[in-house]
């Protein structure tokens, strides 16, 4: 099979872009409605909005689950190798993450400009909430750039993790699919409890990640790289079959 990276990337990018455009329009409408609502708010009341980054992260996680299977099947039908399909998928999700991050900064900055004259109206995003605080109404241009990098790393990592769950369930039979699906909530609650019982203190790691956006970005890309390797291991020998 040929290394047809360009056509595979073009198709997958367009596929990502269509859904992302609809999602962004919805988010822009929500933020616009929020700003319209804030116009008539009294001085004794306060209102805040800071959900763009986390909303996109959830969206990208779902995208990672949904798109990888159909994209792989279509690429193989057109004679494109699994390696090329996987690489083009990674490039597509990186491109969309960058676009959604920049677009998010634009709409957030616009909303912050409108709310600048109202001290009781707060518009902020993930980066500002962690590293600047909500009391700073208008981040600088450099801080918006850093926020875009932070969001890009977050969006990429959660999308690749979503791909992992999709590929994992793709490889499992029905019995193990049910077992793993039931085990996930128990693992999410049980592993932290087990770590505490074993005396493993994660607070230094959490503080290190929260100490600087560079630490956060590095952590996200390390997670993305490690999970991407696991994704490829699941994908390279998978039997191509319909989604469950």
Each language-model region and where it sits:
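Hydrophobic alpha-helical transmembrane segments
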Residues: 1-45, 191-244
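Helix-loop-helix units of permease transmembrane domains in multi-pass membrane transporters
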Residues: 9, 68-94
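Alpha-helical transmembrane segments of polytopic membrane proteins
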Residues: 20-23, 53-58, 147-155, 183, ...
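Secretory targeting signals
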Residues: 33-56, 92-172
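Long, hydrophobic alpha-helical segments
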Residues: 49-70
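Transmembrane alpha-helical segments in integral membrane proteins
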Residues: 67-69, 150-176, 223-238
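Hydrophobic residues within alpha-helical transmembrane segments
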Residues: 90-91, 95, 218, 222
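Central hydrophobic cores of alpha-helical transmembrane segments
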Residues: 174-188
């Amino acid at each position: 099979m040929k290394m047809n990276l360009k056509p595979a990337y073009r198709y997958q990018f367009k596929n990502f872009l269509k859904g992302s455009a609809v999602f962004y329009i919805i988010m822009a409408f929500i933020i616009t409605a929020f700003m319209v609502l804030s116009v008539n708010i009294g001085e004794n009341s306060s209102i805040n909005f800071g959900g763009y980054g986390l909303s996109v992260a959830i969206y990208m996680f779902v995208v990672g689950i949904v798109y990888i299977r159909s994209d792989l099947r279509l690429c193989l039908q057109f004679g494109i190798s699994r390696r090329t399909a996987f690489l083009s998928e990674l490039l597509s999700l990186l491109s969309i993450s960058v676009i959604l991050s920049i677009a998010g900064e634009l709409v957030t900055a616009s909303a912050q400009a409108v709310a600048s004259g109202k001290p009781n109206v707060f518009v902020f995003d993930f980066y500002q909430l962690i590293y600047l605080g909500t009391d700073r109404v208008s981040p600088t241009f450099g801080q918006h750039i850093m926020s875009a990098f932070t969001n890009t790393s977050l969006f990429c990592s959660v999308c690749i993790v979503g791909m992992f769950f999709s590929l994992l369930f793709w490889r499992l039979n029905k019995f193990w699919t049910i077992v793993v699906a039931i085990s996930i909530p128990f693992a999410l609650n049980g592993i932290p409890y087990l770590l505490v019982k074993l005396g493993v203190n994660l607070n230094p790691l959490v503080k290190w990640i929260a100490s600087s956006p560079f630490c956060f970005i590095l952590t996200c890309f390390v997670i993305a790289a490690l999970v991407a390797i696991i994704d490829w291991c699941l994908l390279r020998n998978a039997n191509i079959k319909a989604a469950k």
